[in-house]
UniProtKB/Swiss-Prot annotation:
Organism name: Arabidopsis thaliana
Chain residues that bind ATP: I90, G91, E92, G93, G94, F95, G96, C97, V98, K118
Phenotype upon loss of function: No visible phenotype under normal growth conditions, but mutant plants exhibit increased susceptibility to infection with the bacterial pathogens Pseudomonas syringae pv maculicola strain ES4326 and pv tomato strain DC3000.
Function: Involved in the activation of early immune responses. Plays a role in pattern-triggered immunity (PTI) induced by pathogen-associated molecular patterns (PAMPs) and damage-associated molecular patterns (DAMPs). Contributes to PTI in response to the bacterial pathogen Pseudomonas syringae pv maculicola strain ES4326. Contributes to PTI in response to the bacterial pathogen Pseudomonas syringae pv tomato strain DC3000. Functions redundantly with PCRK2 in basal resistance against bacterial pathogens and in regulation of plant immunity.
Localisation: Cell membrane
InterPro entries: Kinase-like_dom_sf, Plant_Ser_Thr_Prot_Kinase, Prot_kinase_dom, Protein_kinase_ATP_BS, Ser-Thr/Tyr_kinase_cat_dom
The protein, known as: Serine/threonine-protein kinase PCRK1
Complex formation: Interacts with FLS2.
Membrane topology: Peripheral membrane protein
Taxonomy, superkingdom: Eukaryota
The keyword Transport is assigned to this record: no
Length: 418
């Protein structure tokens, strides 16, 4: 059987390698219709088939598309990053390294702006393709929930060809970081809802609001960054692909991505659609709810795969509370959390055609945010630390009495990719 290429996580220096994959779906089509009634919205099951509806099928050359981007010299970026010093390194992985730096503002040379400089590792053709992809996509798209690409550099120096990208600096790091034990900051429930909303807006723009469709293909919490106001923005488009051409339902491609986020039909067939991103978004919602990673080998065996772990707890409210992120310390409206889980469940239908489009997902999330805002001023600034969270402990304002809100669960299958 064909082996599929995955990245097994965000470990430092980890390269994509063939691995065996086991993914399970949460819902059957019938169950998704039942859970969706929470929103009093039209049934979206089975109504969506992917078509580009006239979207373009090829990209113009980088040189014509990158006209809005600033071209940096390697000297500029060495100066900006203290010669790529480890003292200003803010990220490292199989793709290369990211450095914090400062560059002069083009409109006012006396003003310096903070930037993030991504130095791609020397991975031959694949590394160059991912660099070109980022320049192609981010050179022409602009949205408040996408990290802005400011410029690029492709230049030879004593170490050979250097491929670099320069982004707006995102001071509050990634959502993945703040959900991990490494962070002393606690993302409040209100802020998690806004992050879910921001991420849905970004994906909706990519899928539906341009003349061509972009499929992210590597949607995950480590690729969702937070600006100084804690607004979430999607980043890292090196694996992104154009959506299907007119008249086609999917793109056939090598299977790449991150363990725990890839849709089962994509793993099995290599057929990529925007519904693959919708699946990944559903996984991400359970990350926000539980504070856990999709795959965590450091946990006990029965808790290592997030979707498998949550499944037994979803049948009634009392059990459901046991999967909520303990760092929230009970400060959430339980109905709000349940409704977000319903959205996640819609995204995790095994039949990809029965999953909602991202615009429909966004509409559902918007309703949850609006209802949450109606309960008082939302707490959008995270708590400073776990201790501060304990000191501010209050009563759980959630309610009970909604046993069976989830419905019967689908019996999962194991899918082996190799």
């Amino acid at each position: 059987m064909k082996c599929f290429l995955f990245s097994g996580g965000d470990k430092r220096g980890e390269q994509k390698t063939p691995i065996s994959v086991s993914l399970t779906s949460i819902f059957s089509d019938r169950e998704i219709n039942r859970s969706g009634s929470e929103f009093n919205s039209r049934d979206v099951s089975g109504t969506s088939t992917e078509s580009s509806m006239g979207r373009k099928n090829s990209y113009p050359p980088v040189s014509t598309r990158a006209s809005n981007l600033r071209e940096f010299s390697i000297t500029d970026l060495k100066s900006a990053t203290k010669n790529f010093s480890r003292s200003v390194m803010i990220g490292e992985g199989g793709f290369g390294c990211v450095f914090r730096g400062t560059v002069r503002n083009l409109e006012d040379s006396s003003v310096k702006i903070e930037v993030a400089v991504k130095q791609l590792g020397k991975r031959g053709l694949q590394g160059h393709k991912e660099w070109v992809t980022e320049v192609n996509f981010l050179g022409i798209v602009e949205h408040t929930n996408l990290v802005k690409l400011l410029g690029y550099c492709a230049e030879d120096d004593e170490r050979g060809i250097q491929r670099l990208l320069v982004y707006e600096y995102m001071p509050n790091r990634s959502v993945e970081f703040h959900l991990s034990p490494r962070s002393l900051t606690v993302l409040t429930w209100d802020l998690r809802l806004r992050i879910a909303q921001d991420a849905a807006r970004g994906l909706t723009y990519l899928h539906e609001e341009m003349e061509f469709q972009i499929i992210f293909r590597d949607f995950k919490s480590s690729n969702i960054l937070l600006d100084e106001d804690w607004k979430a923005k999607l980043s890292d488009f090196g694996l992104a692909r154009l959506g299907p051409s007119e008249g086609l339902t999917h793109v056939s491609t090598d299977v790449v991505g991150t363990m725990g986020y890839a849709a089962p039909e994509y793993i099995q067939t290599g057929r990529l659609t925007s519904k693959s991103d919708v699946w990944g978004y559903g996984v991400f919602l359970y990350e926000l709810i539980t504070g856990r990673r999709p795959v965590d080998r450091n946990r006990p065996k029965g808790e290592q795969k997030l979707l498998e772990w949550v499944r037994p707890y979803l049948s009634d409210t009392r059990k459901f509370k046991l999967i909520l992120d303990p760092r929230l310390e009970g400060k959430y409206p339980i109905k709000s959390v349940q409704k977000l889980a319903v959205v996640a469940n819609r995204c995790l239908v095994r039949n990809s055609k029965a999953r909602p489009k991202m615009s429909e997902v966004l509409e559902m999330v918007n309703k949850i945010v609006e209802a949450s805002s109606g309960n008082g001023s939302p707490q959008l600034v995270p708590l400073n630390s776990v201790k501060a969270s304990r000191d501010a402990r209050g009563k759980n304002n959630g309610g009970g009495g909604e046993g069976g809100w989830f419905g019967k669960l689908w019996n999962p299958k194991t899918i082996r990719a190799c």
